[in-house]
Amino acid sequence: EQATLIDFGKLNADIVPDKNGGMTQ
């Protein structure tokens, strides 16, 4: 289930980098 969060986080980072503190990968 954690893998989904990581994958989702990466996708979200592209859309909302603010959540990651401005970290776009």
UniProtKB/Swiss-Prot annotation:
Primary subcellular site in the record, as a coarse category: periplasm
NAD recorded as keyword: no
Signal peptide: none
GO cellular component, one term: periplasmic flagellum
Keyword annotations from UniProtKB, A to Z: Bacterial flagellum, Periplasm
Superkingdom of the source species: Bacteria
Localization in the cell: Periplasmic flagellum; Periplasm
Keyword Ribosomal protein listed: no
Role according to the record: Component of the outer layer of the flagella.
Subunit structure: The flagellum consists of an outer layer composed of repeating units of FlaA around a core that contains several antigenically related polypeptides.
Protein name, per record: Flagellar filament outer layer protein
Organism field: Treponema phagedenis
Gene for this chain: flaA
